[in-house]
Swiss-Prot record:
Keywords: Disulfide bond, Ion channel impairing toxin, Neurotoxin, Secreted, Signal, Toxin, Voltage-gated sodium channel impairing toxin. Expressed by the venom gland. It comes from the Eukaryota. This is Putative sodium channel toxin Ts33. It comes from Tityus serrulatus. Disulfide bonds join 34-87, 38-62, 47-67, 51-69. One of its GO terms (molecular function) is toxin activity. Residues 1-20 form the signal peptide.
Amino acid sequence: MKTAFFILLIFSIFYGKAKGAEDREGFPVNRFGCTYPCYYGEDTEKCRRLCRETLGADYGYCFWYACYCENLPENVRRIKSQGFFGCSNGWWVVSTTTRKPK
């Protein structure tokens, strides 16, 4: 009985942490509400730099032709799922990212 309770407790802790991390990931958007386009290959490194160095996330990569970040700070604007974005999918400038003032 103690073993079952212990396993349930461990599962609950890991599920809670994973659930919380999911809430802080997504496609970051700039001040115009546009995602940062990428085309795999060398742009994957651009996404990593955007997510980690500029936005303060733990990790970033190119996913469905847009940069996707994991463990973003709560003050970074993002969208959760990909769709039709209504922004041009051209080259982007990292300086167009906005953050809420501290």
